[in-house]
């Protein structure tokens, strides 16, 4: 596999419309069409046959950035749920005062803290050019699974309101 730079004015190249995504909105995603495109030799990026290696070199940093977002989202979900449980009353007291709520929030907080330690270690490895794909993949797995767990547990702590969009504050670009 080799990498080539295909310029937008090359005959046979066309770009479809931008597709709407749920996340990562800062980068465009669209269909690209290559109909008998001819690319000159000077548009080869790097060495011939090393394209896959070049792509794999960036995977650890890409996986690290996904983990950063997942951990930040988990923390934001936890913080908003803590605020909600303090305000929400049931049986005349705040939901935050219930023992089960305290256990759940403490458990989630501890798991987020653990993921942050792993993230800090991986960031240190990246800065020293020592972060490998396997370790970065483990971090991504841990962080994204944790984000899902935190979202599910926090949804439960919101009760029926956890299923209502009116409670969520979504900012559109």
Regions found by a protein language model. Name each.
Residues 17-19, 38:
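Short, well-ordered turn and helix-capping elements at secondary-structure junctions
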């Amino acid at each position: 596999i080799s990498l080539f730079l295909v310029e937008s004015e090359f005959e046979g190249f066309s770009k479809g419309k931008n597709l709407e995504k749920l996340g990562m909105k800062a980068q465009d995603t669209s269909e690209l069409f290559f109909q008998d495109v001819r690319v000159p030799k000077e548009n080869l990026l790097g060495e011939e046959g090393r394209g896959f290696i070049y792509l794999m070199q960036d995977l650890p940093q890409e996986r690290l950035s996904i983990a950063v977002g997942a951990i930040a989202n988990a923390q934001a979900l936890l913080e908003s749920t803590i605020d909600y449980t303090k305000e929400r009353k049931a049986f005349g007291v705040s939901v935050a005062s219930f023992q089960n709520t305290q256990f759940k929030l403490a458990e989630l907080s501890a798991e987020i803290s653990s993921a942050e330690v792993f993230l800090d270690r991986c960031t240190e490895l990246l800065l020293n050019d020592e972060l490998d794909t396997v370790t970065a993949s483990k971090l991504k797995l841990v962080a994204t699974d944790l984000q899902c767990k935190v979202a599910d547990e926090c949804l439960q702590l919101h009760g029926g309101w956890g299923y209502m969009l009116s409670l969520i504050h979504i900012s559109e670009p």
